[in-house]
A protein has these predicted regions:
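A short, structured loop/turn motif at beta-sheet edges
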Residues: 5-9, 159-164, 184-189
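Charged, amphipathic alpha-helical segments
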Residues: 13-23, 172-181
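N-terminal ectodomain recognition module in secreted, GPI-anchored, and membrane glycoproteins
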Residues: 1-2, 7-13, 19-23, 32-37
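Surface-exposed interaction patches
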Residues: 152-154, 163-177
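Short, well-ordered beta-strand segments enriched in hydrophobic/aromatic residues
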Residues: 9-16, 164-170
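Beta-strand-rich interaction surfaces with strong enrichment in secreted/lumenal proteins
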Residues: 1-2, 153-158
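Acidic/polar low-complexity flexible segments
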Residues: 27-128, 175-221
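Surface-exposed, low-complexity/disordered Ser/Thr/Gly/Pro/Asn-rich loops and linkers
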Residues: 115-149
């Protein structure tokens, strides 16, 4: 892990070895590669495994399939099963012979009828602009996405020669009032930080991951 800042923004580079490039979650038997940074929001850090009930942690999570979607287009079920059949409701205007047999690609559908996307769930949004999510947690089973206004972290990942390189970038101190769920990296301060890596080929997902204990990041003045 490496980090640097210019007084306004901070960037963190995470590099790790992985024998396989797992970048799809379309099938239920497939799992992604991913990496996350966890920041303690308390000077006395809570349990490093997702925080504690009275102590929030802020998490930045990069996901390989989101990066692949941005590079090559949203991975949909037709990409995995190209010969699938798509049924449509019969039309009272056209005969069955005249009805076009379209596809069911998510990006071409009305979000109203794609429950998660229509409800504003960022995980279900096929048009998401970044391969990273800003999350918070205060103990096991409490992980949730921060509101859209807080999704200000940028990230970019590259897999080459059995190695991942992922860069996270964000302003040191987000504008607006101080929020208890967002880390503020003030100049001259020290913040507890931990890391997690998911290996899709090992069927890692959710709490099955490789984690570190708390480390310390010092924001040089």
């Amino acid at each position: 892990v490496r980090a640097l800042h210019d007084g306004e923004e901070i960037a963190l580079l995470l590099v790790w070895h992985d024998d396989t490039y797992d970048r799809s979650t379309v099938r239920p038997q497939d799992f992604r590669d991913a990496v996350a940074i966890e920041f303690s929001l308390a000077s006395d850090p809570p349990f490093f495994g997702m925080g504690e009930s009275a102590k929030l942690v802020n998490i930045w999570m990069w996901k390989s399939e989101m990066q692949a979607d941005l590079a090559s287009g949203y991975q949909d079920i037709e990409d995995v099963y190209p010969d699938m059949v798509v049924d449509t409701y019969p039309s009272i205007v056209r005969s069955p012979v005249d009805q076009p047999m379209g596809d069911a690609r998510t990006v071409g559908l009305d979000p109203t009828y794609i429950a998660g996307w229509g409800a504003g769930n960022p995980v279900s949004d096929p048009t998401r602009p970044e391969p990273v999510e800003v999350l918070q947690a205060h103990g096991h089973g409490t992980l949730q996405a921060r509101p859209p206004i807080d999704q200000t972290v940028e990230a970019n990942g590259l897999y080459r020669a059995d190695t991942y390189r992922v860069v996270f970038r964000r302003v040191l101190t987000p504008m607006g009032k101080k929020d208890t769920g967002i880390v503020r990296l003030e100049l001259g301060t020290e913040v507890a930080v931990a890391f997690a890596v998911w290996n899709g080929n090992a069927r890692d997902r959710d709490g099955k991951k490789n984690i570190s204990i708390w480390q310390s990041i010092k924001i040089a003045p």
